[in-house]
């Protein structure tokens, strides 16, 4: 305000521009201070997050070491026994098997005298167990009557035809497709190998019957009666007794358009693709289904167990735990299930660390659902009927 010569007081008008600048300045200071505070808080939160994450990772690593140490102690305790008559504790030679695969030492130990520790219980129905991956179907074990095709996927459609197929009718169950896709991706990434083609997958009993009857017709001029049936079985499995029925098997070959040199190669004996897949498929839960004498090259004849003497480029999904164990033990599927009957609890170690634990549990033939144990430390499990009166549980750690 100001006082004039008449001593009257007059209020001075404020400059609105200066007021606006002053307000803007104050707001700018508030914003800068706010940003600074937010930045400092963000740094504190980030630092706390990193610290917490590192602490949790360290705790997890320590917990894993403690768990493996505990398992080693349990193995040590279970490998001792009282000597008869003396009562002295002595070391017992529990069976174990070792093999080096891809520069990694794999060891299998028999834990059949020990139970699972710290378990919870799950309930699974028979339908899911049938498609668990380990179902044995061969000349002596028929496809279960309650088997369902539900869940089969077209390999061509599922892969957007990135995986070559004979036609769009080539189907398998999802676990088999996932394993095949992973294996073929690795073949390309690791070895630069492409041009695989899936020639055949799931076969229905009706399709198998057509093939069987066609083979009988070809042989009918030379055989008759039971002799005709038995001779036909040597080339084509009896309907209901083919591994193709499981939806977990697929027959492979190589193919590239306008590349006759590649297309004429014998998949197993001559192509790099066949050699790589046979050597590495176990890493992805896949086995070579029907080894015969020197087919694949250097492999032992298993036809006396499988009942199949034909040279088939057939691969079968069984799951990573089982394919690793079968590779270490050098067993075909028939031998492996017999092995699990004799050794119903085994542990599989990768470079000394527990990787898989496998347990076979007897069940009633007419059981429609089964309560099964799952160790709480396990990160995942696979459950499957074996078609020989048992459920096989495989736990991954």
Where are these predicted regions, by residue range?
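Extracytoplasmic cell-surface/polysaccharide-interacting catalytic and binding patches
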Residues: 2, 9, 13-26, 30-201, ...
């Amino acid at each position: 305000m100001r006082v004039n010569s008449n001593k009257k007081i007059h209020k001075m008008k404020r400059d609105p521009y200066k007021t606006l600048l002053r307000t803007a300045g104050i707001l700018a200071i508030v914003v800068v201070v706010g940003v600074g505070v937010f930045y400092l808080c963000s740094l504190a939160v980030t630092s706390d997050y990193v610290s917490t994450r590192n602490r949790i990772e360290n705790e997890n690593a320590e917990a894993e070491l403690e768990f493996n140490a505990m398992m080693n102690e349990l193995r040590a305790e279970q490998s001792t026994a009282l000597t008869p008559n003396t009562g002295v504790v002595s070391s017992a030679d529990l069976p174990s098997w070792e093999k080096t695969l891809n520069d990694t030492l794999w060891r299998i130990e028999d834990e059949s005298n020990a139970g699972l520790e710290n378990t919870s219980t799950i309930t699974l129905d028979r339908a899911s167990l049938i498609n668990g991956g380990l179902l044995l179907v061969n000349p002596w074990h028929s496809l279960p009557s309650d088997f369902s095709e539900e869940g089969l996927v077209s390999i061509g459609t599922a892969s957007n035809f990135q995986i070559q197929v004979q036609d769009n009718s080539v189907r398998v169950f999802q676990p088999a497709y996932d394993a095949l896709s992973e294996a073929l991706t690795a073949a390309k990434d690791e070895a630069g190998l492409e041009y695989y083609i899936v020639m055949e997958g799931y076969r229905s009993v009706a399709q198998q019957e057509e093939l069987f009857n066609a083979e009988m017709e070809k042989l009918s001029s030379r055989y008759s009666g039971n002799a005709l049936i038995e001779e036909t079985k040597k080339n084509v499995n009896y309907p209901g007794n083919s591994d193709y029925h499981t939806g977990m098997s697929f027959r492979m070959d190589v193919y590239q358009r306008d590349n006759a040199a590649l297309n004429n190669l014998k998949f197993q004996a001559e192509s790099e693709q066949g050699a790589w897949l046979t050597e590495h498929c176990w890493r992805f839960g896949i086995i070579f289904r029907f080894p015969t004498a020197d087919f694949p090259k250097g492999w032992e004849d298993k036809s006396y167990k499988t009942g199949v003497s034909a040279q088939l480029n057939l691969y079968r999904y069984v799951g990573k735990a089982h394919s690793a164990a079968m590779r270490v033990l050098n067993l075909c599927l028939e031998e492996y299930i017999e092995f699990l009957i004799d050794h119903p609890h085994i542990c599989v170690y990768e470079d000394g660390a527990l990787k898989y634990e496998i347990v076979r549990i007897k069940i009633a033939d007419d059981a429609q659902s089964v309560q099964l144990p799952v160790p709480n430390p396990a990160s995942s499990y696979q459950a499957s009927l074996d078609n020989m009166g048992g459920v096989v549980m495989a736990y991954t750690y």
